[in-house]
Amino acid sequence: MSTNEKNITRGGEFIIKETDCENIFSPEDFSEEQLMMKQAVSDFIDKEVMPHRERFENKDYKLTEDTMKKAGDLGFLGVAVPEEYGGMGMGFVSTMLVCETISGAVGSLSTAFGAHTGIGTMPIVLYGNQEQN
């Protein structure tokens, strides 16, 4: 985001309140770090996923498991996890970019990714005790 803070409209606020065009978040507002993360995930998808697309779609679970481990080793499974818990602590926008890039690749992998990060990891981060985190 630029050095000038915007009063970004959150969630569905645009439905109930007037919004100036300057306060709309757009891709031009992505930071260099966020764009680098998106590119890293895109490169990973091109190298590790797309050449094996048919195997993923034919339910090669071992390939999905191995690919998820590689994604984890690269930090893609912990983008939203705070650094003190071993994640990258990059926030919502970076998380959205990673999810968007992975979800556009192969359905079965994006389902595994979404289940791991959304159903598995985030509830522990948000609601787990210190030991669980």
Question: What are the functions of these language-model segments?
Answer:
Residues 49, 111-131:
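N-terminal glycine-rich flavin-associated loop
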Residues 64, 77, 120-121, 133:
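Alpha-helical structural signal
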Residues 87-88, 131-133:
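Glycine-rich, Trp-frequent "lid" loop and neighboring beta-strands that shape
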Residues 1-114:
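Amphipathic, small/basic residue-rich leader segments at the start of a protein or domain
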